[in-house]
């Protein structure tokens, strides 16, 4: 699949579409299957057994895993699920990005402003000449036209621009990668190669929504004014989003702080039973939920728990417990999307980013005196089984738990914690540092941890 070069400034690289990726990956699996183990599948890690030759059934499973991975990655990175009908056609967000000089409205959004909003640029989509001009500072990052060029090159992570033949932007849709990928900053801060699964804690989703010219779609469903919608989303801040707003209409907590929650990572989730901060369901439940109800894609979603006028009045008004679309742009993609997400392991911290000796002592505390491993069971770091706890058990208020069907908080899987220290910890970032989390547990569970022990625990958490 080749994306054509339209812009004189930025060229779209050859995008490795499904068939290309598939072919490459199939070759690499065949390499393992036929080359390394002479006709055998790779043996299980600890197996002392002789591996028998691969059967047709074994081979077909291995080939399916390659296909699922490639398709799922394509969906995670590039599928909008038809969400352009909401972000473009209804909210007209593309017009605000373009600005009046380019067929839109207002001043437009420059690349520098987009980077300030936490949007990321995928350098694999840019030709070397553009990367050089970025590094030498000669590419104009203060012109909304360059933003449009980047969108045309499919280089803005998680955002897809649609253009007509006159190169005018006509709509815009969003992808999973918007919130759950970032980049490695290899070219410049905010510009580099993709890191799938990392929560984008720089992304100011609320500020992006707030610049949309027409928020009537949200205002109508929430039964408030557009100004109120703007005030609610402007209060979210970087790294946060409120997936429950369009279910219960609650924009703020009782203490008047935003009701939004942090964007969690979407890696290290294999083996974890329930997902999201409040354990709404499995990974695939949430994938269907978010693509239909939050991204405003067009698919099928069924969850009768939402048909609860007391807890979810907005969802009931909008009929969100039983969504059907024709054509269904989501359901056929859910299996591979699930598979891809489970394949994303939590990234290991680099050497030297934590103190190894202290981490080793912290590990003993985690399993022993501090009692953490009772809930954060290694190596999943959540409970195998029903990984949910009442607000009282962990010593916090019930506001966010009450916005979900189970009324509980899910034990966060802790691997890769080092990647998401920005924005704080716990669902709403209430603890600014890991040390603050440990202080909370020290008080709540009466642990009598010494200062040195707390430091060791922090080092252990940073090593996961
Ligand atoms: C606008 C930002 C945004 C987009 C787009 C988005 N998510 Fe999320 N995602 C979130 C937030 C916020 C949460 C936490 C929700 C909660 O607890 O209420 C979350 C939670 C999750 C979780 C649970 C993680 C865990 O720790 O259990 C998964 C899995 C996930 N999202 C996958 C996806 C997939 C797949 C897509 C695309 C179909 C997607 N998300 C699109 C913001 C987003
Ligand atoms: C009773 C079960 C339980 C015990 C014991 C427990 N935790 Fe937790 N932990 C949770 C739950 C539930 C959450 C999610 C809270 C939230 O998001 O509001 C959590 C969240 C966390 C987080 C934040 C993760 C994130 O992504 O923001 C850290 C860090 C953490 N726990 C570390 C520890 C440490 C260290 C200990 C031992 C001192 C410990 N926990 C003991 C249940 C537990």
What residues fall within each predicted segment?
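Periplasmic c-type cytochrome electron-transfer domains
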Residues: 2-11, 19-21, 28-464
């Amino acid at each position: 699949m080749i994306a054509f070069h339209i812009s004189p400034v930025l060229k779209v690289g050859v995008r490795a579409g499904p068939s290309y990726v598939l072919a490459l990956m199939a070759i690499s699996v065949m390499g393992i299957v036929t080359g390394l183990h002479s006709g055998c599948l790779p043996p299980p890690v600890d197996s002392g057994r002789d591996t028998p030759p691969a059967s047709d059934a074994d081979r077909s499973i291995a080939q399916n895993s390659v296909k699922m991975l490639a398709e799922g990655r394509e969906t995670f990175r590039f599928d909008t699920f038809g969400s352009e009908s909401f972000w473009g056609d209804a909210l007209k967000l593309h017009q605000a990005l373009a600005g009046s000089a380019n067929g839109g409205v207002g001043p437009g959004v420059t690349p520098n402003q987009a980077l300030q909003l936490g949007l990321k640029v995928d350098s694999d989509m840019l030709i070397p000449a553009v990367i050089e001009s970025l590094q030498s500072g000669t590419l104009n990052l203060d012109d909304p036209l360059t933003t449009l060029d980047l969108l045309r090159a499919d280089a803005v992570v998680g955002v897809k621009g649609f253009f007509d033949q006159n190169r005018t932007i006509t709509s815009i849709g969003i992808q999973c990668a918007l919130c759950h990928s970032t980049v490695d900053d290899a070219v410049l801060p905010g510009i580099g190669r993709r890191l799938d699964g990392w929560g984008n804690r720089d992304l100011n989703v609320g500020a992006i929504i707030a610049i949309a010219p027409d928020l009537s779609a949200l205002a109508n469903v929430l039964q408030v004014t557009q100004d109120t919608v703007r005030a609610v989303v402007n209060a979210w801040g970087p790294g946060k989003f409120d997936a429950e707003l369009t279910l219960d209409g609650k924009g703020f907590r009782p203490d008047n702080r935003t009701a939004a929650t942090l964007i969690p990572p979407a890696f290290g989730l294999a083996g974890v039973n329930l997902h999201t901060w409040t354990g709404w369901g499995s990974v695939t439940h949430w994938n269907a939920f978010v693509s239909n109800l939050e991204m405003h894609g067009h698919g099928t979603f069924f969850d009768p728990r939402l048909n609860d006028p007391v807890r979810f009045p907005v969802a009931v008004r909008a009929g969100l417990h039983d969504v059907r679309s024709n054509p269904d742009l989501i359901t056929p993609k859910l299996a591979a999307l699930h598979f891809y997400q489970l394949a994303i392991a939590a990234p290991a911290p680099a050497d030297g980013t934590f103190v190894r000796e202290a981490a080793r002592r912290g590990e003993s505390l985690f399993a022993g005196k501090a009692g953490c491993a009772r809930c954060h069971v290694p190596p999943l770091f959540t409970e195998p089984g029903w990984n949910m706890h009442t607000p009282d058990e962990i010593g916090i208020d019930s506001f966010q738990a009450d916005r979900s069907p189970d009324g509980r908080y899910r034990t966060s899987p802790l691997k890769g914690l080092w990647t998401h220290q920005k924005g704080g910890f716990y669902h709403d970032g209430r603890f600014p540092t890991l040390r603050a989390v440990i202080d909370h547990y020290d008080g709540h569970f009466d642990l009598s941890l010494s200062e040195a022990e707390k430091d060791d625990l922090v080092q252990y958490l940073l090593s996961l």
